[in-house]
Design a protein with these regions (language model features):
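Active-site/ligand-binding neighborhood in enzyme catalytic cores
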Residues: 50-51, 177-303, 307, 312
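Conserved Rossmann-like nucleotide-cofactor binding loop
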Residues: 63, 86, 323
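N-terminal Rossmann-like FAD-binding beta1-loop-alpha1 element of flavoenzymes
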Residues: 50-80
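Glycine-rich FAD pyrophosphate-binding loop
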Residues: 72-96
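Extreme N-terminal leader/targeting segments of oxidoreductases
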Residues: 2-55, 73-74, 521-562
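Dinucleotide-binding Rossmann-like beta1-alpha1 core, especially the glycine-rich loop
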Residues: 98-194
Length: 562
């Protein structure tokens, strides 16, 4: 110990100290060769590292980086394993020999993404556009024009969403049929009871039961599901639908959106990963997890296996999408031991196809962000003017468009040229100027089974943040959480929740601060409280009636016996 104490002080370089040489190497006055002192220092560093608890995170993107971000700041020895050589799932760049870098999917960042915006402030970066107006198209033209809600006088929920957007083809009488939907949104409080109550029913059935008009469903509600839950209403869980609606429409401004001014992987993930690396986290690429080894005494995960490599772990976080986790489960004898992981094999994911087009001229597009429906019964899509959204395309001589297609299984087998032809035809039906513009370059990227499908009945197969292995935790946008957020914000929050579970399990470090979803407006809280009281009274009444019937039958039986 005294040697390590000496090595913490600056060593003098005078001839009195370096007065002897041995084999051409300097030897200090204490009798230690300089290289020996360096060895002591290295051993001391290794000893300190060995004392740190080891956490292995599998998967990057918002959940994996979120967990790594906090745990590395708490001094844990964190290793993040990536199956590929690029991080960020659907939001990193793709290189194509015929075109500049192309991004897979253009994610929006909604007003209630408070935890993500807090992270951006912490990183000291400015990756976002200003708040952006949007439009929704059908083959008949513009169906909805959405303003920036926070710029308008605030109305009680849901009045702002009903009256501020422009609905050229949707009469007020149809819009008003959505009001009964508020009762279901209020009844859905994101508890386990609420999810199980609504999950088996399709969104289409729910809207029909509540009296929503067919035109409202066709022109507004179903298009929202196609780009929000990536599937048509008859294939969406009504519980997931209510969860999404209650998050994005709880307050007038919640649907406002900004976009990244470039590839998310470059603008956000790259500086974020550099920050995490500075905290000591290791990023290892091209490491596909094949199995786990268990501690024979505790039954906990002892090592993460990647082919011939093994990584010791005091705790493990799986921050993966459904398809990636299913692949691991299919290979892992350890995960196959648990029913909860076998249940994951019942879940499904949705295909995405993204198309980026470089046009030979400028096309005037009223809104930079646009969603579309009605061109295909089961497929939703969105298109974006990247010359307005992305910095790198501002000086392009022609317009650069990205079109992202969800539930795009019908596009997967088609050749690129066929897909591009269809996309160009769809765009021309939205905006006439696309018809005369020529495509000078293109990138088509297919992502089969890449986003979560919240189908009716899926809730019972989904995992919670904690698992049957006491040191194995989950994160991702499909993991059950009571936070109430959605999409990227939910993915990031579950990463922080996983980090907090690791800290709680290992008994070290400070918990991550997670910003709660903003409280409901007072009238919504009052209605929700009233609904709970009515449900409680209904339950008590049913219990009283059943008790009365039981004692009546018992009394009658006693009389017969006598």
């Amino acid at each position: 110990m005294w040697v390590s104490g000496v090595s913490n002080y600056p060593l003098p370089c005078s001839s009195n100290f370096l007065r002897r040489f041995n084999g051409g190497r300097e030897v200090g006055a204490l009798g230690f060769r300089a290289d020996t002192l360096e060895t002591y220092r290295a051993n001391e560093v290794e000893s300190e590292a060995a004392k740190k608890k080891k956490v292995v995170i599998v998967g990057s993107g918002w959940p994996g980086l979120g967990a790594a971000h906090h745990l590395s700041k708490q001094g844990f020895d964190v290793t993040l394993l990536q199956a590929t050589s690029c991080s960020g799932s659907l939001v990193t760049g793709q290189k194509n020999a015929a075109a500049p870098s192309s991004e897979i999917g253009i994610p929006g960042f909604r007003c209630p993404y408070h935890n993500i915006f807090c992270l951006i402030d912490e990183l000291g970066i400015q990756p976002f556009t200003k708040w952006t107006k949007s439009a929704q198209y059908s083959p008949e033209g513009v169906e909805v024009e959405t303003p920036i809600f926070q710029d308008l006088p605030r109305l009680p929920t849901p009045l702002g969403a009903l009256f501020y957007p422009l609905f050229p083809h949707l009469p007020s009488v149809d819009r008003l049929t959505s009001v009964p939907l508020l009762s279901a949104v209020i009844d859905f409080d994101n508890t386990d009871v609420a999810w199980r109550k609504y999950d088996m029913m399709t969104a289409r059935e729910l809207f029909k039961q509540l009296g929503c008009s067919e035109r409202l469903y066709r022109n507004a509600l179903n298009p929202l599901l196609l780009v929000g839950l990536f599937a048509p209403g008859e294939q969406c869980s009504s519980a997931a639908t209510l969860g999404m609606l209650s998050y994005f429409f709880a307050h007038q401004q919640d649907f406002d959106v900004v976009y990244c001014r470039g590839v998310v992987g470059e603008k956000i993930f790259k500086p974020w990963m550099e920050s995490i690396k500075m905290n000591g986290c290791r990023f290892l690429e091209n490491r596909k997890v094949t199995d786990f080894l268990l501690d024979g005494t505790t039954g906990n995960i002892l090592e993460v296996v990647c082919g011939n490599e093994k990584f010791l772990a005091d705790s493990v976080v799986l921050a993966l999408g459904i398809s990636d986790l299913q692949q691991i489960i299919m290979n892992s004898s350890v995960l196959q031991m648990r029913e909860e992981f076998l249940n994951v094999l019942n879940l499904r994911a949705i295909d995405v196809v993204t198309v980026r087009l470089w046009l030979d001229r400028k096309v005037k597009i009223p809104k930079a962000s646009n969603t579309c429906s009605g061109f295909n019964d089961s497929m939703g899509w969105a298109f974006f003017d990247l010359t307005l959204l992305h910095d790198e395309y501002k000086d392009e001589p022609g317009t650069v468009i990205e079109a992202d297609f969800y539930h795009a299984n019908q596009f997967l087998p088609l050749k690129d040229e066929v897909i591009v032809g269809k996309v160009k035809s769809y765009l021309a039906r939205c905006i006439n100027e696309f018809e005369v513009a020529a495509v000078v370059d293109q990138v088509v990227v297919r992502f089969p089974k890449s986003v979560t499908h919240f189908f009716p009945g899926s809730y019972k197969y989904m995992l919670r943040g904690s698992t049957g292995f006491s040191n194995l935790f989950m994160a991702g946008d499909w993991i059950i959480t009571r936070h109430g957020s959605w999409s990227q914000e939910k993915a990031y929050v579950t990463g922080l929740e996983a980090a907090n579970r690791v800290i709680d399990y290992l008994g070290e470090g400070k918990f991550a601060r997670i910003i709660a979803v903003e409280e409901d407006e007072p009238h919504v809280q009052a209605l929700r409280s009233l609904g709970r009281n009515i449900n409680d009274l209904r339950t008590q009444s049913q219990s009283t009636i059943l008790t009365f019937i039981f004692f009546e039958e018992k009394s009658v039986s006693s009389v017969h016996i006598q």
